[in-house]
Structures are given as structure tokens and as C-alpha cells.
């Protein structure tokens, strides 16, 4: 059966293992994503999500997570990379990095500052900025960030 929708099947959220000094444990990450991607029924992985420390990792570390995941999972494993930034410019930079590093799709998180105030034009502008720099499919993360 051929699937038109690349998001079919199970997509598992992964963690980003950290060392005691708070640096990314690249070997543990490679082992983790490799193991999770090979579980029966898994079609894809979410990397750089909340459990993937996307609030904590630097931009370079987020890019590195995508690179390590891409090198550690089967080519058929769909990688969706989380994008989480307060600034639309930084979110766009993360999107470009993720695409270049081998992500297949992006999950764009809302800026936390929207908890204070946001309107429809802000939401549209932020996501349009990210969409404008990448050819990847984008999933919008819904979170309660205010009214």
C-alpha cells in the first residue's frame, strides 16, 4: 500500500540525553534514536521537541541533534524537527538549519511570550516567516499560551 501522507503510522517523540555538565550526549542520542526508530510500527521520530530539550539546547545543538538522528536511523524514518524560538528570525534560522541537516518536516512551537499577549496577525506573521525559508512540510504546535 502506497501512502500519500508522510505522517502515516506512529511517530515517536524522543529525548535528548544530556551529560552531567549539561552538554548533549551525542553517543547516547545516536543509540536512543536508532533504537526507537527500529521499534515495530514506528514510521517517524519527533526530535527537538519538549522532551528533546528544545527550550535548553543551543541552535548549534539543535542542528546537531538533527544530523545525529539522520545518520542513526533508517533512511525511511521520517524526522520531524521541533522549532522553538521567541523570535521569528531565530525560528526561521532553526528551520533552515533543520532542513539542511536532514529533517523531513518541522513542528513549529509558539513563542512563550505569546502567553502575555498575541493576536492573529502575530501568529500569521511568525509562521509565515518560518514557512518562507523552507520547503519542508510544517506542523503547527498548539499550546495554551494565553487567551
Residue spans for each PLM region:
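Active-site beta->alpha loop and helix N-cap motifs at the rims of alpha/beta catalytic domains
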Residues: 2-147
